[in-house]
Amino acid sequence: MPTISQLVGSERKRLTKKTKSPALKSCPERRGVCTRVYTSTPKKPNSALRKVARVRLTSGFEVTAYIPGIGHNLQEHSVVLLRGGRVKDLPGVRYHIIRGTLDTAGVKDRRQSRSKYGAKAPKD
């Protein structure tokens, strides 16, 4: 706790909030190009092969992004749209690829939560 004379000399420092997705540069989404598409294993106690991509963004950053949903069509040089949002069991993955935009296809045969996976309405 500062004294009155300390506060007269210099005011209190404002706390600055640190962003959880710095590569987006305060934008809701960013475009990027996949440099590598691969699978990664999660932290304990989980076990899986999570699909991730290394993406070079228009902001100049190169980040690791998660590919949500079952099956994908991404490969090297695919143009993707990224949003914030980490994957809790993959260290260093702080972004999600948005399905159904640019080169990323929506999830096939998806019937529930379709808007989150870029899937069109079923034909029946």
From Swiss-Prot:
CDD domains in the cross-refs: Ribosomal_S12
Assigned keywords, A-Z: Methylation, Ribonucleoprotein, Ribosomal protein, RNA-binding, rRNA-binding, tRNA-binding
GO cellular component term, pick one: small ribosomal subunit
UniProt-listed GO biological process terms: translation
Record's keyword annotation contains Ribosomal protein: yes
Alphabetical list of InterPro entries matching this protein: NA-bd_OB-fold (IPR012340), Ribosomal_uS12 (IPR006032), Ribosomal_uS12_bac (IPR005679)
Keyword RNA-binding: yes
Parts forming coiled coils: none
GO molecular function: rRNA binding; structural constituent of ribosome; tRNA binding
Alphabetized Pfam families for the sequence: Ribosom_S12_S23
Record PTM 3-methylthioaspartic acid, positions in chain: 89
Transmembrane segments: none
Region annotated Disordered, chain positions: 1-28, 104-124
Role of this protein: With S4 and S5 plays an important role in translational accuracy. Interacts with and stabilizes bases of the 16S rRNA that are involved in tRNA selection in the A site and with the mRNA backbone. Located at the interface of the 30S and 50S subunits, it traverses the body of the 30S subunit contacting proteins on the other side and probably holding the rRNA structure together. The combined cluster of proteins S8, S12 and S17 appears to hold together the shoulder and platform of the 30S subunit.
Record family assignment: Belongs to the universal ribosomal protein uS12 family.
PANTHER family: 30S RIBOSOMAL PROTEIN S12 FAMILY MEMBER (PTHR11652)
HAMAP family in UniProt: Ribosomal_uS12_B (MF_00403_B)
Subunit structure: Part of the 30S ribosomal subunit. Contacts proteins S8 and S17. May interact with IF1 in the 30S initiation complex.
Protein name as annotated: Small ribosomal subunit protein uS12
Organism from which the protein derives: Prochlorococcus marinus (strain MIT 9301)
Classification of source organism: Bacteria, Bacillati, Cyanobacteriota, Cyanophyceae, Synechococcales
Gene name for this UniProt entry: rpsL
